[in-house]
Amino acid sequence: MMSILREDEEGTLARLFTTPTDRTSILTGKFVAVFFTVILQGIVLMVAGRVAFGIHWGNPAGVALALLGQVIAATGLGVLLISFVKNTRQGGPVLGGGLTTLGMLGGLFTANIPGGMPAAFNAIGTFIPQGWVLKSWRMVLDGQTAGDLVVPFLVITAMGIVMFAVGAMMFRKRFA
């Protein structure tokens, strides 16, 4: 997603906008590229986890749903966060800060604390994609079926689509 900022700074984005291609289509193209890159990263990490550490990821259909939901949410969140950034220098701090904060609120840093976190803190995760992604992976690793993962998958996917749509609207206003 940083490529959009780089193209804006280098002037190539302005040239893209002079073509008959809709701005949302340009953003969707970036989204698709990131989507497939993140899927590939997930697969590589899962294979490495299996080979290096013997991790059994669970039911393949459940794994596919969890990974697909995670990727949709991650790419949608990436579009949303990058829409707040004005140049490449701001990209690292905004993306890093946003992802770290949401990861903490979603329970990614506290998932293995003995006794867990207070209920109010855990409730925050139900409003954040990272909380639902964590829930779906826990379900997969606990051996639940793909059918059990439908609700988390739909919630994660809906969040990803909404974040993408909001980010796309912000980009449309910015580059109108």
Which residues are covered by each model-predicted region?
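Junction motif at the cytosolic side of a transmembrane helix
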Residues: 4-5, 80, 141-144, 155-176
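Membrane-interfacial segments
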Residues: 8-9, 52, 56-57, 85, ...
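Alpha-helical transmembrane segments and their short interhelical loops
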Residues: 23, 27-95, 100, 147-153, ...
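A hydrophobic alpha-helix feature that marks transmembrane segments and, especially
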Residues: 1-12, 83
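Membrane-interfacial helix-loop-helix junctions in multi-pass membrane proteins
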Residues: 107-163
